[in-house]
Amino acid sequence: MFNEKDQLAIDTIRALSIDAIEKANSGHPGLPMGAAPMAYTLWTRHLNFNPQSKDFFNRDRFILSAGHGSALLYSLLHVSGSLELEELKQFRQWGSKTPGHPEYRHTDGVEVTTGPLGQGFAMSVGMALAESHLAGKFNKDQFDIVNHYTYVLASDGDLMEGISHEAASFAGHNQLDKLIVLYDSNDISLDGDLDKSFSEDTKQRFEAYGWNYILVENGNDLDEIDNAITQAKSQQGPTIIEVKTIIGFGSPNKAGSNGVHGAPLGEEERALTFKEYGLDPEKRFNVPEDVYEIFKSTMLKRANENEEAWNNMLKNYSEAYPELAEEFKLAMSGKLPNNYADALPEYDLNHSGASRADSGEIIQKLSEFVPSFFGGSADLAGSNKSNVKEAKDYNKDTPEGKNVWFGVREFAMGAAINGMAAHGGLHPYAATFFVFSDYLKPALRLSSIMGLNSTFIFTHDSIAVGEDGPTHEPIEQLAGLRAIPNMNVIRPADGNETRVAWEVALESEQTPTSLVLTRQNLPTLDVDKQTVENGVRKGAYIVFETEQQLEYLLLASGSEVNLAVEAAKELEQQGKGVRVISMPNWYAFEQQSSEYKESILPSDVTKRIAIEMASPLGWHKYVGIEGKVIGINSFGASAPGDLVVEKYGFTKENILKQVRSL
């Protein structure tokens, strides 16, 4: 089945990776040199993926979780016709399509951004979850309209990361059949021999999760690799294939050592290695025509045939199930149904509710009118109000179910949501307590880097949590999330702001959203619908203003907005001119014009107070050197919530006191 041309192709891929790294004088040659045979076998014999048709919905997904081995992926993309050779020559250089670690939306053929070890593995679980759910929802007899695999190339480091344990446990529990992990098991980590830090029995570990385990003893045996992948595709449940490789294979002096993990070979070792491969070291970035032909006649031919057959099946599916087909096409587009927002609840002045509860009510309507809406909670659905009441649970028996039980696996949940968003066909969300956002912070960051439409629900947003005490009362989390570029961090002040916050979350196609919601009830602000709609979308707006000459600005978010209004009304009775500004989304506000910002925060009004039950970090930008911030510079306390709030100075009386001190 395999012949000398296959070996030439593998060694060419190795050589391209080496040359790219040598030219950049930066990179990780060890993994591409060791893992090239398994990647080649997967791409030429199994992968249903055409880089030139990168948006084909039913393609297989390939995730290089070991993102430091990016030169391998770029070499594969080149020989399969997606990436120009010149881009390999610009590896890790400014403006190139070959950055140090693979970047989603930056390079065609890269499914997700990887590099932070373990996250690619966990995002792959999310992709397999998306495939399973969409297949359960749309597939019919003779119409497997969603039917593809998620393949992962993972390293020792990926499997050491804690997130891999969370994600593997979840995948095994849910028996995600279409998930296949190729584990590059080379017994070397960056610092040295793996046995200095890692001695797990991979077989026992993954079988305990409910995975299938296959061992490939020789990572250069193409038939053994091919047979293992074929076997994995025939089994129920996820499969990990441990492929024993030699890091830096072919390097006479560095193979099998950590010296080849993260540094160029050097010119002398490069020449020796090329001779080991039977290649001419004088030729750089050389790709024989036979190598291109192999990929054209195998991978690309197969992918084109599969895509053509799928398009014909979709046409027949559309005739047999027209309504379902329209829903599927809308899901593939990533768009929302027209006028979906008209179905969302509006709240009058008689309403008082926790923003988490209002969000829960909104979620019921979103699930009804946005079929692609899908997600769950990290074992806090009852508290987060995040489950869809009329929907089934997602599991292996009811994959069409809409409520995902992520369990107490916050980090894996966050990464899985990102995987689902990158997969397409869904508007995914995840939920937990705000204080536990720290557990999934790296996934939040990666969602922003990738520009994903991921939504994260964070409830119990302040010291008003009360009795649970400082471990469960967020302080620094708001400032931390606001510091992430390209992240909507929305802390709504009432049910109507919460409604618009959800609209922003779903409509922000390339910006993830964190919804920061209260446990305690909030009265409805006396503001008309259009003002709220426009104001929340712009990040800050006026919710109350006296008729007197403007003298004071009170800025707040969330539950503190109503407190600011109460203080402003007292000041109004004293004849003071005061404006209250709700600032639910700093990120959106910073994108507004200078004219809009000036209309909200007039520069000639310097007596300003910001009120927020969190770290004051960041507010000084808005209050200026003459202003004050009523915030919290310590951790919370355990007591009834109302008492804790009072003790920390979040009272009308303290606001008035601070105003008088200006």
From Swiss-Prot:
Sites where the protein binds substrate: H28, H261, R356, S383, H460, D468, R519
Catalytic residue list: E410
Pfam families referenced in this protein's UniProt entry, alphabetically: Transket_pyr, Transketolase_C_1, Transketolase_N
Entry's Gene Ontology cellular component terms: cytosol
InterPro entries for the chain: THDP-binding, Transketo_C/PFOR_II, Transketolase-like_C_2, Transketolase-like_Pyr-bd, Transketolase_bac-like, Transketolase_BS, Transketolase_CS, Transketolase_fam
Annotated site residue numbers, Important for catalytic activity: H28, H261
UniProt catalytic activity: D-sedoheptulose 7-phosphate + D-glyceraldehyde 3-phosphate = aldehydo-D-ribose 5-phosphate + D-xylulose 5-phosphate
Binding site for Mg(2+): D156, N186, I188
EC category name: transferase
Pathway connected to this protein: Carbohydrate biosynthesis; Calvin cycle; Carbohydrate degradation; pentose phosphate pathway
Keyword vocabulary terms for this entry: Calcium, DNA recombination, Magnesium, Metal-binding, Thiamine pyrophosphate, Transferase
Binding site for thiamine diphosphate: H68, G115, P116, L117, G157, N186, H261, F436
Gene3D superfamilies: 3.40.50.920, 3.40.50.970
Bound cofactor: record note: Binds 1 Mg(2+) ion per subunit. Can also utilize other divalent metal cations, such as Ca(2+), Mn(2+) and Co(2+).
EC number assigned by the record: 2.2.1.1
Similarity remark: Belongs to the transketolase family.
Name this protein carries in UniProt: Transketolase
Source organism of this protein record: Staphylococcus epidermidis (strain ATCC 35984 / DSM 28319 / BCRC 17069 / CCUG 31568 / BM 3577 / RP62A)
Gene: tkt
